[in-house]
Amino acid sequence: MGSCSLFVSALFLVTIIVSLQTGPARALTLSTKSRWIVNESGHRVKLACVNWASHLDAVVPEGLSKQPIEAIAGQISSLGYNCVHLNWPTYLVTDDSLASLTVRDSLKSLGLTEAIAGVETNNPSIIDSSLFEAFQAVVSALGDKNVMVILDNHVSKPSWCCSDSDGNGFFGDIYFDPNVWIKGLTRMAILFKGVSNVVGMSLRNELRGPKQNVEDWFRYMQRGAEAVHWANPNLLVILSGLGYDHDFSFLQNRQVQLTFSGKLVFEVHWYAFFDGKAWESGNVNQVCKIVVQNMNRISLFLLEQGFPIFVSEFGVDQRGINVNDNRYLNCFLATAAQLDFDWGQWTVVGSYYYREGVIGMSEYYGVLNDDWSEARNSSLAQKISSIQYPFQGPGLSEVRKHKVIFHPATGLCVVKKSLLEPLTLGPCSTSDYWYHSPEKKLTIKGAFCLQAVEVGKLTQLSIKCTDSDSKWEPTSDSRLQLSAKTSSGDSVCLEVDSSNNVVTNTCKCLSIKHSCDPSSQWFILVDSTRKPRLF
C-alpha cells in the first residue's frame, strides 16, 4: 500500500479505538484454571453463548433490518445466554475500503433494497454508519445487557462458510494469507482493548481443506495466539482444530508452546451431520456410544489434560422435524451436562440478508424466528437452557459433591415434591442431593433410596430397599438407561411419562432396532456441588 493508504488505515484505527473506549472503563478479565474459565476472583464463569453472524457478503450483523439492535440483545439475554460468539471476516479490519463502507452502500451493492428499508426503520442510527461501526454497535448493545462477546474470526473474504474449496479454509489458501490473518487478529484485539464485555478471541473458524496439516497448524496458530495476547493480554485465546474444528488428536502427545499462560482455550464443533445420517438410520444407543467415544478420542480428552473445551458450535433444526438432529441432541445434552463444558449454539440468526445467492433465507437452526421477534421453538429453547447452568467448578463448591439425575430429552432433572410423593421432573437447579453408592444404590437424605417398582408404576422413595430392587446401574451401549430388578426379578428402566412423572418400564432399544428411540429412558448421573435453589 502507498503512504496515503497507510495514513487512512492509521487514522481509522485511532478513531475507532477512541470511540470504543468511551464505554465502561474496566474490562471483565477472564482466565483459565485447569479445565475451567474463571473471573478475577477465581470463580468459574461458564460460557453459555450463541453465535451471531456478521461475516457474510454484506458484512453487516444479521437481523438489523428486522429488529432494533437493543431488542435483539435483549432477546439473547432473556433466553439465558451470557455470551455471543460474534463472527467476523478478516477483511473487515485489513481492507480499509471495506471497513469504511457504509451499511447502506454494502446492502445496496447486493441489491438488498428491502433490507435497507428495514435498517432505516429499526436501526436508523446505523444505516449510514461504517461496517465496523455497525459491528461496534452490536458489541455495545450486548454490553448494555451484560452479555459477554467472543470475537470469532470466521473467514477472511466475507462469505457463507464453509467448504473445502472456498479459498478460506487453511493457511495458504487464496483468501487465507497467514500474514494478513495475523494483522487482522492484531488489529481486532487492539480495537477492542478495554471494552468491558469483550472477553476472548476465537482465532479461526473451521480449519479445513486439502492444505491442512499439523506442522502449519502449530506454526501459525501459535503465532496468532502470541499476536492476540501481545495486542490485548486480557483476552482468552481460543484455538480451533483441524477437520472443520473437529479434530485435536494431534495434541495427545504434543503441546502448544506459548510465552503466556492462563489464557488458552480449545474450541470444538459438534453437529449431527458430522456423522451423516447415522442418528436416523442406526441404533441410537450404539450411535451415541460410538460418537461420544470418538469425540473423547479426538477432542474432549483435552479436558483431562487440564484445558477448557469450548464447544463453540452445535445446533439443530429448530422446527423439530429432523430426526437425525433430534436424536443427536439428546446425546449431546447428556454429554454436555456430564462434562459441564462451555459452549456456543449455532445460531441466534432467524434469517439472513443474503446467503449463497438467496435474499432473505430462513435459518432453521436459528434460535429466533424469521423476523427475529421471538424464539422459533420455545420448548427447545427451554431444553437447551438446562446446560446454561454450571454444575461445578471453582467457587461453586457450595455443598459436598453429589449427583443430579439429568433427563436430556426434557432438559430437566429428577426431583421430589416430598418424601411420600412420586418422583417427577423439575429444573436441575432445584434438584436434591443424590448419592450413588458403591453398592449402586441411589439414595437421598441418607435413609431414603430409589426403589424399583413394577412395570408402569410411579417411582418413589423408600426406606425398605433390598439389594435386588434398589441397585441401579447404567445399561445399554449408551450407558444412559438406569436399570434395576424389581422384587419379582423383572428388569426395569427408569422412564418419564407424558406428564413428566418418573416411572419404571421395560428397557427399550437394547437390541439392534434402528427405528427405536430410547430417549424417554435416557438419564445420566451428573456431578454437582451446587445448593438447590428454592423458587
Task: For the regions a language model picked out, list residue spans one by one.
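Aromatic-rich peripheral "rim/lid" segments of glycoside hydrolase catalytic domains that contact
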Residues: 321-411, 429-430, 516-535
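Short Gly/Pro-enriched loop/turn and capping motifs at secondary-structure junctions
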Residues: 315-319, 350-352, 487, 499-501
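A mature extracytoplasmic/lumenal domain signature
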Residues: 51, 88-90, 153, 270, ...
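Lectin-like carbohydrate-binding module/patch detector with strong preference for beta-trefoil
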Residues: 390-535
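Glycoside hydrolase catalytic-domain groove-lining segments
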Residues: 214, 218, 222-319, 337, ...
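Bacterial N-terminal signal peptides that target proteins for export
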Residues: 1-10
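Active-site mouth of glycoside hydrolases
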Residues: 32-236, 241-253, 368-371
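N-terminal signal peptide
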Residues: 13-29
